[in-house]
Amino acid sequence: MSFFTQLCSMDKKYWISLAVLSVTVLISALLKKRATETEDIVVVHYDGEKLNFVLRQPRLNMVSYTSFLRRVCNAFSVMPDKASLKLNGVTLKDGSLSDQNVQNGSELELELPKLSPAMQQIEAYIDELQQDLVPKIEAFCQSSPASAQDVQDLHTRLSETLLARMIKLDAVNVEDDPEARLKRKEAIRLSQQYLSKLDSTKNQNK
């Protein structure tokens, strides 16, 4: 029996199954190609991390620098005020991304300005306050003390610790740094709120 005769003698169901499989594979390939053609991906690096940003609607040629920067900063949980994006070392400007040679597959760098020495000290103060003292203050305000003396002792210890740190904060030189001066005011205001909270709890437990 010839090869052609063997083919003709094959079950009709086999040919139908083969045809269905071929069509399925073809459709899958077309859909995958279409999906690729209808989306752009831009990679952004920041602080050792890398995120892929998929752009479908609107497409890359319709996306502005400002809106994309806002999306990137939100994903990395940073403030967009002074952040910037760079492509091959060149800082991007407001306007269309595609007009600045950002293409599908481009890799960008998210950069934030370096903090001044004064800002670094103030940020360190706030971090230490939030991570170290605030949990202790909150625990003091929510606990049921054994005696009025316990309240007094713990209040004194926490208040003196906070005041000592505020004195160091006040010594930070912000004379030529308006931004640091404003940030220090915010830190002092926050600290005073916790001092008031300590005093209020002490007075309630007299």
Swiss-Prot record:
Q: Which GO terms of type biological process are on file?
A: nuclear protein quality control by the ubiquitin-proteasome system; protein folding; protein stabilization
* Residue ranges of domain BAG in the record: 122-202
PROSITE patterns found in the cross-reference section: BAG
Question: Domain of life, per the record?
Answer: Eukaryota
Annotated Gene Ontology cellular component terms: cytoplasm; cytosol; membrane; nuclear membrane; nucleus
Q: How does it assemble?
A: Binds to the ATPase domain of HSP70/HSC chaperones.
Name the record gives this protein: BAG family molecular chaperone regulator 1B
Supply the source organism for this entry. Answer: Schizosaccharomyces pombe (strain 972 / ATCC 24843)
